[in-house]
Amino acid sequence: MLERTFSIIKPDAVKRNLIGQIVSKLEQNGLKVIASKMVFLTVQEAKGFYAEHDGKPFFDTLIKNMTAGPIVVQVLEGDDAIAKNREIMGPTDPENAPAGSIRKEYAISMQQNSVHGSDSPESAQREISYFFSEIEVFSAS
């Protein structure tokens, strides 16, 4: 089923010039980038985006990492895009990520794990609309 998902290339990966490699890996696995832009999150924007994690032990570190430099936000489209993107990324902890996954190849640590991806259709819609207006997203089909 053709669907859309949301992806972030995090500051740790942007700083290390990994944008191209990460996008290539997504495209080679059947996902199309249908919207993309580079932004620098303020602390308030990061807290708003990650509000569901407020109060968790890792929240402050997450906000610090996500505001440490620019990020690349993207809308991806493809068959089962949410599950496919999560498979390509690998689990949050790069130590547990399979060979060939983005996090295994590029993550520095569990906190600096290079990428974020939506985990459900509801999250994808919310996350896409947080960063993109409808006129900024183009269908690949």
UniProtKB/Swiss-Prot annotation:
Its EC number is 2.7.4.6. One of its GO terms (biological process) is UTP biosynthetic process. CDD domains: NDPk_I (cd04413). SMART domains: NDK (SM00562). PROSITE patterns: NDPK (PS00469), NDPK_LIKE (PS51374). NCBIfam families: PRK00668.1 (NF001908). This is Nucleoside diphosphate kinase. It comes from Hydrogenovibrio crunogenus (strain DSM 25203 / XCL-2) (Thiomicrospira crunogena). The lineage of its organism: Bacteria, Pseudomonadati, Pseudomonadota, Gammaproteobacteria, Thiotrichales. The gene is ndk.
